[in-house]
Curated annotation (Swiss-Prot):
Organism: Halorubrum lacusprofundi (strain ATCC 49239 / DSM 5036 / JCM 8891 / ACAM 34)
Species lineage: Archaea, Methanobacteriati, Methanobacteriota, Stenosarchaea group, Halobacteria
UniProt biased composition (Basic residues): 1-30
Keyword tags: Ribonucleoprotein, Ribosomal protein, RNA-binding, rRNA-binding
Function: Binds to the 23S rRNA.
Protein name according to UniProt: Large ribosomal subunit protein uL15
Length: 165
């Protein structure tokens, strides 16, 4: 027998107040958050700001497209003048074929699936798997001018930081 239970021996209500109190949930004002009139306040959520929000200038919007989708839809892109046919190869700029591609900061080509056509894809970023699939099919993955400029810029800033240190 637990100590508390032992102590309560001989007590009529075992610490529960009067004999009326431990009948159902009435003594507690209902179950859970019952009773919304000034009583459990369940309809008032937490207020105020909390957490951390990165500034808009620090956020980059990345749109993604898979190599398999580019491969499957290459003929459609060529028909819609979104891509060019160069012999057996399709020359595709990922920004042209992704919806809102020119509004995004980065358009990235992801690997996955199969590539049956020779593709020459230009994008801001590629995964290693995407580059591998494109090159296995005889195509090439080229970084866009925008991505190269950003890479040059980051190299310049890191060189400046090294000089200061």
């Amino acid at each position: 027998m637990t100590n508390k239970k032992r102590r309560q021996r001989g007590s009529r209500t075992h610490g529960g107040g009067t004999h009326k109190n431990r009948r159902g949930a009435g003594h507690r004002g209902g179950r859970g958050a019952a009773g919304r009139a000034k009583h459990e306040f369940h309809n008032y959520g937490p207020l105020g700001k909390y957490g951390f929000k990165r500034p808009e200038s620090a956020q980059t919007e990345v749109l993604e497209v898979t190599v398999q989708k580019l491969d499957e839809d290459a003929a459609l892109y060529a028909a819609d003048d979104l891509a060019e046919e160069d012999g057996d190869a399709y020359v595709i700029d990922a920004r042209d074929v992704v919806e809102d591609g020119y509004e995004a900061d980065v358009v990235k080509v992801l690997g996955g699936g199969q590539v049956r056509r020779e593709l020459r894809v230009t994008a801001d970023a590629f995964t290693a798997g995407a580059v591998e699939l494109i090159e296995e099919a005889g195509g090439e993955a080229t970084l866009s001018e925008r991505a190269e400029e950003a890479a040059d810029e980051s190299e310049n800033t890191s060189d400046d930081e090294d000089d200061e240190a």
